[in-house]
Every structure is written in structure tokens, then in C-alpha cells.
């Protein structure tokens, strides 16, 4: 769940453990994705051509359209540097990705999803970023989308991905979200990526990291 804090883009809270006087403080930082670099890439099922949609798109798609069979992969970019970011020498206690689901198709069944940690600079999307061979994943996790997630926040544990990003010393936490391919029924989700200032603290993708 997101918190109605005006300065949500760079909000940090220091939590000091009460277990002992010499304990290391844990800092929690909340970082909204950068809509300038967020976007999605669609692969046309018939023609095999890519369509890149980026820069303040308001929403991004991930999954396979059950009607057209076009496949979409969403990309989210969270800057880790600067005030409110995550220092390169920090240890990661935990990390979560919070996304708001605007729509789910088809309106039945569960959609298996995959999140890849990726890295490309500058963070401008091009068609080949769709390809997991040409743009390989540094680490991956899977999670399900249920019909009950429609119109709600979905919070995914991305601790392993954030630790890998730290290990590589990445300046951004960049993820590719797609349907976990296999013998599954096609399904697609629409993720809110609003640029409306009043709405971003409530609906924009949010990375929350606890570090020490």
C-alpha cells in the first residue's frame, strides 16, 4: 500500500533497531519510477515487428493479448543515485515493487508474470530490449496476477533483484515485466504509470528499499 505523502518521489525514513545500543540503523527509501524512461514494447503476432511506446505514457502493458496474441513487455526505471536513493555501498535488507493494476485480460484465470532485472544506458527503450537474448536478464523472479488484483496494488518482493543491482553497482533499478512464457493461457495487464502530480504518490510504480 502506498502512503499519501506529498514528497513521495524521494522519501526516506530511518528506522533504528531496538535490539541493542550498537545496532546498525536501517533506512527505508521510497522511489517512484521515472515516467520519462518507462514504457513498453509490443511484438506484433502477425508481422513480427516491434512497437516501442515510451516517455510519459500514463500506463504500460505486460503480457500477451488474448485476442490478437500480440506480446507486450513493460519497462520501469527507478533512479538509485542522489538524495533519497540507495548508496552503492549499502547492504539490502529488503525491497518491494508496488504496481497498480488498471486492467486484466481475460477476466478469468491467473496470469503468471516474470520480472527481469535489466541494465542499459542511456535508459532509452529500443526494440531489441524486448529480446531476452539480446537484452539478457541479470536476475529474474516470477509472481502471479489474480483476478482479484484488478483495480488494486500488487506488491512484489524484489529483494533478490535489488541485491543483484547493488552487486553490479547499477545507477538505476531497471526491470522488464512480461508474462512467464510456457504452456499458459495468454493474458495481459495494464500497469498505471500516471504523470499527474496529484496521482503519482498513489498510483505510479513504487520501489521501496530497506538498506543499512
Question: Could you describe each region identified by the protein language model?
Answer:
Residues 80-82, 99-103, 119-121, 160, ...:
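Beta-strand elements of well-folded, non-transmembrane domains
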Residues 14-17:
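C-terminal motif of bacterial Sec signal peptides marking the signal peptidase cleavage site
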Residues 69-70, 91, 147-149, 166-170, ...:
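Extracellular/periplasmic catalytic domains that process cell-envelope and extracellular macromolecules
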Residues 104-167:
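Beta-strand-rich interaction/scaffold domains
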Residues 45-103:
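A short beta-strand-loop element at or near the start of a globular domain
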Residues 2-9:
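Sec-dependent signal peptide recognition
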Residues 22-32, 163-212:
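Proprotein-processing/basic-patch segments
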Residues 19-65:
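N-terminal leader/pro-regions and domain N-caps
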Amino acid at each position: 500500500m502506498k502512503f499519501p505523502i506529498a514528497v513521495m518521489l524521494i522519501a526516506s525514513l530511518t528506522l533504528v533497531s531496538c535490539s541493542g545500543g550498537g545496532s546498525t540503523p536501517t533506512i527505508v527509501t521510497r522511489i517512484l519510477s521515472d515516467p520519462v524512461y518507462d514504457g513498453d514494447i509490443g511484438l506484433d503476432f502477425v508481422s513480427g515487428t516491434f512497437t516501442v511506446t515510451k516517455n510519459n505514457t500514463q500506463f504500460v502493458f505486460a503480457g500477451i493479448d488474448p485476442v490478437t496474441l500480440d506480446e507486450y513487455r513493460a519497462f520501469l526505471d527507478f533512479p538509485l543515485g542522489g538524495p533519497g536513493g540507495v548508496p552503492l555501498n549499502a547492504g539490502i535488507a529488503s525491497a518491494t515493487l508496488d504496481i497498480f493494476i488498471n486492467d486484466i485480460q481475460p477476466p478469468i484465470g491467473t496470469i503468471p508474470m516474470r520480472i527481469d532485472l535489466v541494465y542499459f544506458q542511456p535508459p532509452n527503450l529500443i526494440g531489441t530490449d524486448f529480446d531476452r537474448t539480446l537484452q539478457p536478464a541479470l536476475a529474474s523472479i516470477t509472481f502471479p496476477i489474480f483476478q482479484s488484483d484488478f483495480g488494486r496494488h500488487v506488491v512484489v518482493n524484489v529483494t533478490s533483484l535489488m541485491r543483484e543491482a547493488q552487486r553490479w553497482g547499477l545507477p538505476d533499478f531497471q526491470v522488464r515485466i512480461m508474462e512467464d512464457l510456457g504452456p499458459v493461457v495468454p493474458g495481459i495487464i495494464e500497469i498505471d504509470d500516471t504523470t499527474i502530480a496529484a496521482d503519482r504518490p498513489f498510483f505510479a510504480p513504487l520501489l521501496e528499499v530497506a538498506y543499512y
